[in-house]
Amino acid sequence: MLGFEKAADKYLTSWAYWMYKAFHDHTTTAAENQEGIFNPDGTLQSYKEKALSRTYIQYYQGEPLEVFFNDETSEFFARFKYDGSIEEPSVLYLNKELNYNNGYKLDITDDKGNKIEEVELEEKENYIYFKVNRDKDEILIVKITLTPF
């Protein structure tokens, strides 16, 4: 599953996990008792829950260029080309309980690593909304780095 997720990140594509519970599907590549997200006793397979709770950006205030999530450390990185004509914020999803239970550091910088000061930021539950307020015609690459404590 993790290999598929990394490939989806590399090619900036979305994905969905559809095997909710075991159906004894002979076409699956999973080993016995590994189909679905639940164990045979009905408990959640925690490693799959963590694998499926990756940090990602749902909406970009521009064009996505690159995204990476480290499954072991939960560090997240993304780059996008800023489009000042977009009035809505970018929306980042993060699972605080599974990946950032001790908190996190969010950095929003340009491609050279300089902090972008003109940012409206709002955090709600497992979402971070951020809107860059720079000149609408400015050519700007925005880098997002989320690092767990």
Give residue ranges: language-model regions:
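Short, solvent-exposed loop/linker segments at beta-strand-coil boundaries, enriched for Pro/Gly
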Residues: 110-117
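Aromatic-rich peripheral "rim/lid" segments of glycoside hydrolase catalytic domains that contact
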Residues: 1-97, 103-105, 109, 137-141, ...
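Beta-strand-rich ligand-recognition modules
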Residues: 118-149
